[in-house]
Amino acid sequence: SEDCTPWTATPITVLAGCRDYVGEQ
């Protein structure tokens, strides 16, 4: 989530390495 894009990120970001963006705003 630290490397995540804002909550506007799409599930694609998960594949990019953003695993827990779903659990964070």
From Swiss-Prot:
Cysteine-cysteine disulfides: none
Secretion signal, residue range per the UniProt entry: none
Keyword Heme: no
PTM section of the record: May exist both in a glycosylated and in an unglycosylated form.
Localization in the cell: Secreted
GO CC annotations, alphabetized: extracellular region
Protein name, per record: Alpha-amylase inhibitor
Organism expressing this protein natively: Secale cereale
